[in-house]
Amino acid sequence: MAEQTSRLAIIIDSTGAKNNADNLTSSLVKMTQAGETAANSAGKVTKATEDEKNALAKLKAAIDPVGAAIDTVGRRYSELKKFFDKGLIDKEEYEFLVRKLNETTEELSGVAQAQREAEKAGKLAAAQQEAQAQAFQRMLDKIDPLAAALRNLEQQHDELNAAFASGKINGSQFENYSRKIQETRRELTGEAQAEREAAKAHDEQVVALQRLIAQLDPVGTAFNRLVEQQKQLNEAKAKGMLSPEMYEELSGKLRAMRSELEVTQSQLSKTGMSAKQTAFAMRMLPAQMTDIVVGLSTGQSPFMVLMQQGGHSAMQETRIASLPVTAIPAGMKIPCVTAGSA
């Protein structure tokens, strides 16, 4: 009896344990199902959150497309950096792509456009300033054309230097053009005109002085002319313009004139003849020899030259003969070339 009771107690206990196990299993299943339900709910919440996040990102991109594009470029840069760190692209390609991303970022941020606008504005301002400067310079050129011409000469000289430095012209051409520019500059500044006027004034002063000397000392002036004419004869002979015979003949005439002048000078010192009378009597004699030399140097026939100068000598004799007797002292010899001696 006791044994049966014990078995019954064990059976009862086993049944209770089984029921408890079944209840526990059922509870665990329910808990698992509840966890899965909760997980599904959480997934739905997460998905809903991602959808909302994406929708928000799209909204921001619509509101600020430039900012969204810049963010995208930033992410692309991060991805590119990862690929470079992993060795998937080399340094050259990486730097090229980074440069492209930077250019894209500058374009999106407006920096490049702003730079272009600033450069355009700067060029426009420079062009306007240059136009104003040119207009002002044209006005100055009208006011002072001489300064404008000199400035143009300076520009031409600079261009000439550049052409010579680049080998476009040789040294001879450079010197020739430089000399022309210098001559033009001297003409513009009046320097050349001043030199010509100074030379002309000097020549006039020399002529006036020679005329005065001739009036004060006609015999001495005649001697000087004879010396000069002898030099001209020597030069003509040296150049082959005179034959030895013609040279000796003309030189003999000069020597004869010199002798006559010496006699006249001696008698003037004795008689005290006025300088004016002496100059009138002898002023044509040296000029005749000059005409002879010039005629021969130009290629005239010696016969024609002597015939012409012989006629002049005859005319001179007539002028001298017409002087008052008191103008020529008795016994005075007038040095002249007669028609027969010519």
From Swiss-Prot:
Domain of life of the source: Bacteria
Pfam families associated with the record: TMP_2
Misc. comment: Encoded in the Rac prophage.
Name of the protein this chain belongs to: Protein YnaA
UniProt organism field: Escherichia coli (strain K12)
